[in-house]
Design a protein with these regions (language model features):
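N-terminal helix-turn-helix DNA-binding module of bacterial transcription factors
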Residues: 1-61
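Short beta-strand segments enriched in small/hydrophobic residues
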Residues: 18-22, 58-73, 182-189
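Amphipathic helical "hinge" segments at domain boundaries
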Residues: 34, 38, 47-114, 118-121
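Structural motif
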Residues: 96-117, 168-169, 214-235
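Flexible loop/hinge segments that line or gate small-molecule binding clefts
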Residues: 103, 121, 125-170, 191, ...
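Hydrophobic alpha-helical
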Residues: 128-131, 196-257
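Hydrophobic alpha-helical segments within soluble ligand-binding/sensing domains
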Residues: 158-185, 221-231, 249
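An alpha-beta-alpha
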Residues: 169-214
């Protein structure tokens, strides 16, 4: 198998120095004459040369890559957010690497180390899990952004997402205003800050003294289906069901029809 062309090959074919080729590909073309730029471009095209992003990141201690960690890449909401982020990054000349944590703390910690090894320009955490490693990372790096799940207490970092408590509160208040009976909350894991905030908001919106059946489950369609099956099979009645996210709601709807 032929070796990929190098910067030296481009310099040799174009008749310029390797320093000139390096300046051109590192975005410093203003220091290179138009004639030499044209020669470098022709040589690179003829050889099929592309600069090494790894080599560039080692030289600059930073890459053009932004790493996004997500809890479940199969979730429609997660996919929509990832596509939007990638589109925005492309507009400013950056690329994105998407990695799945599977809602596992150890996997998230390993991926944080991978991002550090890649010299990622920034890390976007959707559905972050509070771990000592994450806290260490937040303390050492400024380019971390939390999405959809707020950073835990003591971690100062930018957050993009909704007010989960207020969202739950609005639904609870709506239930009361509409006269819905037998409220049920099928919510996400309690150890996730967003899940807790949504549930607490919902209970607050219902008001003191409200009796609410609660089911804790994963943020998946199957989990929502299983909870609804258990509820409807054992006690057939009319329920007003609050679902913590759309995937749980899809599962509940499938069980109810």
């Amino acid at each position: 198998m032929a070796k990929p062309p190098t910067i030296r090959d481009v310099a040799r074919l174009s008749g310029v120095s390797t320093a000139t080729v390096s300046r051109y590909f590192s975005g410093k073309a203003d220091a290179v004459s138009p004639r030499k730029i044209e020669s470098v471009q022709r040589a690179a095209k003829a050889l099929g040369y592309t600069p090494s992003e790894i080599g560039r990141s080692l030289r600059l201690s930073q890459s053009r890559v932004v790493m996004m960690l997500v809890p479940d890449a199969t979730n429609h909401f997660t996919a929509d957010v990832a596509v939007s982020v990638e589109s925005a990054l492309k507009e400013i000349g950056l690329s994105m690497v998407l990695a799945n944590t599977g809602e596992k703390a150890a996997q998230q910690d390993r991926l944080l180390s991978d991002a550090q090894g890649l010299r990622a320009r920034a890390i976007i955490l959707q559905g972050a899990i509070d771990t000592p490693r994450l806290r260490e990372f937040v303390a050492q790096h400024r380019n971390l952004i939390f999405v959809n799940r707020m950073p835990a207490s003591g971690m100062a970092a930018p957050y993009v997402g909704i007010d989960n408590f207020q969202a739950g509160f609005s639904v609870g208040k709506y239930f009361v205003e509409r006269g819905y009976i037998n409220p049920v909350a099928i919510h996400g894991p309690r150890h996730y800050s967003g899940s807790t905030a949504r549930l607490d908001g919902f209970l607050g919106g219902l008001g003191e003294g409200a009796r609410v059946r609660q089911f804790e489950c994963a943020y998946t369609m199957q989990a929502g289906y299983d909870c609804a099956q258990s509820l409807l099979e054992n006690e057939p009645a009319k329920y007003s069901i609050f679902c913590a996210n759309d995937m749980i709601a899809y599962g509940v709807h499938r069980a109810a029809v």
